[in-house]
C-alpha cells in the first residue's frame, strides 16, 4: 500500500499557540493556500487515490473533503484512531503556560495528560490503524489527513527514531509524507511537500529483509491493537 499523509488546515487555535488536541477551532485566514498547495503538488505528480481517510475531528474531516473533491472521490472514511493526542482539560491553554506547569509537555511520551492520554498511547492507536490498513489493502494508494502529533508518531515508529527526541518537531500544514508499505512494514519514505526536517538526504529505502530481521532501530514500546478504534465511519460528500 502507498499512503500519502498530510496535515489538516491551520486553525485559529493553531495560530494562537494554544492547545487543541481533541477540540476544534475555526479555520485561520490562510488555510486555503496551504490546502491548495498540497492538492496541487499531488496533482502535478499524477497521484491517483483509491480512498481517503481522516481523523473524526472537524479540521481533518473538512480538509479530507476538500482533497477528495479535487480527486473525484465521493466518500471519506473517518476514525478516532487518527485523532490528535487527547490533551484532556488542557484544551485552549496557552502552550507556554502548559510547558511551565507541566514540564513533561512534549518531553515525556509516556506522560498522561489530565483527563486525556499520552503521546505513546496516541502513537499506538494510530500506528495500529495504519499498519492494519496497509495489510488489508496492499494494492491501494490512499490519502490520509491527520495531525502533527500523529505524523510525528508515524515517522518516529516507521523510521525507527527515538520518539521522545521528536515530540517538539514542527510539522507544516504543507507537509506531504509518502509512506510505501510491504504488508504492515514501511519500506520507503519520501516527502513531497514542505520538508519536515526528518529527512536530510532524500528518499529513505528500508529493505524488507532488514525490517523482517529487525536490523534497523525499533521503538521501545510494542504497538498494540486498538479494538476500540477499529470501526470506520464513511461519509458521502
What would you call each of these model-derived segments?
Residues 1-2, 44-45, 73, 85-96, ...:
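Acidic, low-complexity terminal tails and accessory targeting/binding regions
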Residues 12, 59-61, 84-85, 150-152:
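Short, active-site-adjacent cap segments at secondary-structure transitions
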Residues 1-8, 144:
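Short, hydrophobic/glycine-enriched beta-strand segments
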Residues 147:
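Short basic (Lys/Arg) and small-residue
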Residues 66, 153-157:
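Active-site signature of alpha/beta-hydrolase-fold catalytic machinery across serine-
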Residues 13, 21, 25-26, 68-127, ...:
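Phosphate-handling substructures
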Residues 36-43, 127-135:
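Generic structural signal for well-ordered alpha-helical scaffold segments
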Residues 6-74:
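Active-site-proximal alpha-helix that buttresses catalytic centers in soluble enzyme cores
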Amino acid at each position: 500500500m502507498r499512503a500519502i499523509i498530510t496535515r489538516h488546515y491551520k486553525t485559529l487555535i493553531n495560530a494562537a499557540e494554544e492547545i487543541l488536541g481533541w477540540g476544534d477551532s475555526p479555520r485561520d485566514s490562510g488555510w486555503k493556500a496551504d490546502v491548495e498547495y498540497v492538492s496541487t503538488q499531488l496533482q502535478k505528480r499524477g497521484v491517483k487515490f483509491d480512498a481517503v481517510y481522516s481523523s473524526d475531528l472537524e479540521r481533518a474531516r473538512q480538509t479530507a473533503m476538500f482533497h477528495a473533491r479535487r480527486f473525484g472521490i465521493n466518500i471519506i472514511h473517518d476514525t478516532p484512531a487518527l485523532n490528535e493526542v487527547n490533551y484532556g482539560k488542557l484544551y485552549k491553554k496557552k502552550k507556554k503556560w502548559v510547558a511551565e506547569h507541566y514540564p513533561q509537555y512534549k518531553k515525556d511520551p509516556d506522560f498522561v495528560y489530565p483527563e486525556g492520554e499520552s503521546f505513546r498511547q496516541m502513537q499506538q492507536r494510530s500506528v495500529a490503524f495504519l499498519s492494519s490498513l496497509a495489510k488489508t489493502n496492499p494494492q491501494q494508494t490512499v490519502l490520509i489527513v491527520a495531525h502533527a502529533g500523529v505524523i510525528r508518531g508515524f515517522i518516529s515508529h516507521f523510521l525507527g527514531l527515538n520518539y521522545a527526541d521528536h515530540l517538539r518537531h514542527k510539522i507544516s500544514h504543507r507537509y506531504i509524507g509518502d509512506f510505501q508499505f510491504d504488508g504492515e512494514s514501511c519500506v520507503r519514505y519520501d516527502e513531497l511537500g514542505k520538508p519536515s526536517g526528518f529527512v536530510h538526504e532524500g528518499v529513505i529505502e528500508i529493505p524488507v529483509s532488514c525490517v523482517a530481521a529487525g536490523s534497523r532501530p525499533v521503538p521501545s514500546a510494542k504497538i498494540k491493537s486498538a479494538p476500540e478504534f477499529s470501526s470506520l465511519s464513511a461519509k458521502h460528500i
